[in-house]
Amino acid sequence: MKTSIASHLLEKVRAENPLVHNITNQVVTNFTANGLLALGASPVMANAKEEVAEMAQLADALVLNIGTLTKETVESMILAGQSANKKGIPVLLDPVGVGATTFRLKAAKQLLEQVNITVVRGNAAEIAHLLEVDGWESKGVDAKAANGDVSALVKQAAKTLQTVVVITGEVDVVSDGEDVLSIHNGHEWLTKVTGTGCLLTSVIGAFCAAGERPLHASAAALLFYGVAAEKAAQYTQNKGPGTFQMELLNALSHTTGNDVLTLGKIGRNVT
């Protein structure tokens, strides 16, 4: 995949202004909504089971995030997901901290069984826990350093889950079970602000709504987000994570298709 595809998709997202329905966690709701607005998409944050199926029918993409789960939230996610499947829009799953508790793992597997998921995005530990693969550690909802083969893991996950899988980290990787693409953009400051991964999943949702193959749409979103993070870090300089959060929102608005074309770094991995 070339960076020109990502550049084109960014412009298409901004032209079409897709409505992204988020059933997400309490910690990141505001940041996610503002990030989608900065990108050029439209967010809606509806989680009441009385309306989620109807809301999903209005949306162009649906994002399910298990960061602050309740039994009622899981019910809403299933209703919204099945409604989105009927409409034929992309559904994304962010299995935040899925290895932390039995409840989270059970909920994530329930969603994968009852909803046709287009893209799963998580860190390496989260994806490994979904597959019940040993050797990848987590701390609460965060990943710890590991020495495993992330490219092999993402390809295995995509095959097993029969969906596109994105693993984010120092290098981001995405696979559809056949190809593995790696994105070499981003900045360490992304790990210092809560919600940057959750927002990324919603950004991927906006790109998937643009109609490209989920593999390419996911890679394009990763390129855009990584370039925006690098630009935000330049403006942050020696300041703190609060400044970076603000500058990331600014960069999501100001990063152009030409920025992605010239600054994006993508490779194709052989596993």
UniProtKB/Swiss-Prot annotation:
Positions with a binding annotation for substrate: 45, 195
Known cofactor(s): Mg(2+)
Transmembrane segments: none
Gene3D superfamilies named among the record's database cross-references: 3.40.1190.20
Record key words, sorted: ATP-binding, Kinase, Magnesium, Metal-binding, Nucleotide-binding, Thiamine biosynthesis, Transferase
InterPro entries xref list: Hyethyz_kinase, Ribokinase-like
Pathway: Cofactor biosynthesis; thiamine diphosphate biosynthesis; 4-methyl-5-(2-phosphoethyl)-thiazole from 5-(2-hydroxyethyl)-4-methylthiazole: step 1/1
Catalyzed reaction equations: 5-(2-hydroxyethyl)-4-methylthiazole + ATP = 4-methyl-5-(2-phosphooxyethyl)-thiazole + ADP + H(+)
Entry's Gene Ontology molecular function annotations: ATP binding; hydroxyethylthiazole kinase activity; hydroxymethylpyrimidine kinase activity; magnesium ion binding; phosphomethylpyrimidine kinase activity
Nucleotide-binding as UniProt keyword: yes
Gene Ontology biological-process annotations: thiamine biosynthetic process; thiamine diphosphate biosynthetic process
GO CC annotations on file: cytosol
Binding residues for ATP: 121, 168
Protein EC: 2.7.1.50
One protein family per Pfam: HK
Function text: Catalyzes the phosphorylation of the hydroxyl group of 4-methyl-5-beta-hydroxyethylthiazole (THZ).
PANTHER family per record: HYDROXYMETHYLPYRIMIDINE_PHOSPHOMETHYLPYRIMIDINE KINASE THI20-RELATED (PTHR20858:SF17), PHOSPHOMETHYLPYRIMIDINE KINASE (PTHR20858)
Family assignment from sequence similarity: Belongs to the Thz kinase family.
Protein name: Hydroxyethylthiazole kinase
